[in-house]
Amino acid sequence: MQDSKEQRVHGVFEKIYKNYDQMNSVISFQQHKKWRDKTMRIMNVKEGAKALDVCCGTADWTIALAKAAGKSGEIKGLDFSENMLSVGEQKVKDGGFSQIELLHGNAMELPFDDDTFDYVTIGFGLRNVPDYLTVLKEMRRVVKPGGQVVCLETSQPEMFGFRQAYFMYFKYIMPFFGKLFAKSYKEYSWLQESARDFPGMKELAGLFEEAGLKNVKYHSFTGGVAATHIGWK
């Protein structure tokens, strides 16, 4: 079951990589950038920090971490899609971010020693992994004591009416946008499935705690369509 999901997700991102950034802006109405900016303000990344961005994709959050940590920082980005990483590599090169290293790897088995990073992030990637808890435990393992594990992800609005409209949007309109702008109806149908099945905010906070993280907090964005969860080691 896990292998099947992993293979399917890998195929999705290997196909949509060229239009991924554009589609993120289209389907979120540009809100994903604001959510990430707000999350970065909450994190308050220190200059010179060591950070890992798991499921980094095209490296937007990786680059945001590098900007916050400065030239003295050390930032790693990891993703299992080589095509997505190729887009990220070009951004890193164009921006001159010498403090960034992008790696091809698996979020379920992070290739780093225990207690390595000050911050470990995952943005719009946790819902696509085979096992949420395994990845959160791996993120906790590689973060330093006192460090932050941070997840920015789609969530499930709780307000009646808005919740129903949200799921209608994900089920019908988002795949249509995928077909219209990226010629990828099937792939964007999968993304709505993964968002639909992802835990709500309280349930995800519980998984953070089950992974061994402390003082878990979450922040809801845009009526609950997305949320940031932060836990400390």
Swiss-Prot record:
GO terms for biological process: menaquinone biosynthetic process; methylation. CDD domains: AdoMet_MTases (cd02440). It comes from the Bacteria. It is an enzyme of class 2 (transferase). GO terms for molecular function: demethylmenaquinone methyltransferase activity; methyltransferase activity. PROSITE patterns: SAM_MT_UBIE, UBIE_1, UBIE_2. SUPFAM superfamilies: S-adenosyl-L-methionine-dependent methyltransferases (SSF53335). InterPro entries: MenG_heptapren, SAM-dependent_MTases_sf, UbiE/COQ5_MeTrFase, UbiE/COQ5_MeTrFase_CS. Pfam families: Ubie_methyltran. Its EC number is 2.1.1.163. It catalyses: a 2-demethylmenaquinol + S-adenosyl-L-methionine = a menaquinol + S-adenosyl-L-homocysteine + H(+). S-adenosyl-L-methionine binds at T58, D79, N106, A107. Pathway: Quinol/quinone metabolism; menaquinone biosynthesis; menaquinol from 1,4-dihydroxy-2-naphthoate: step 2/2. Keywords: Menaquinone biosynthesis, Methyltransferase, S-adenosyl-L-methionine, Transferase. The keyword S-adenosyl-L-methionine applies. Methyltransferase required for the conversion of demethylmenaquinol (DMKH2) to menaquinol (MKH2). Belongs to the class I-like SAM-binding methyltransferase superfamily. MenG/UbiE family. This is Demethylmenaquinone methyltransferase. It comes from Bacillus subtilis (strain 168). The gene is menG.
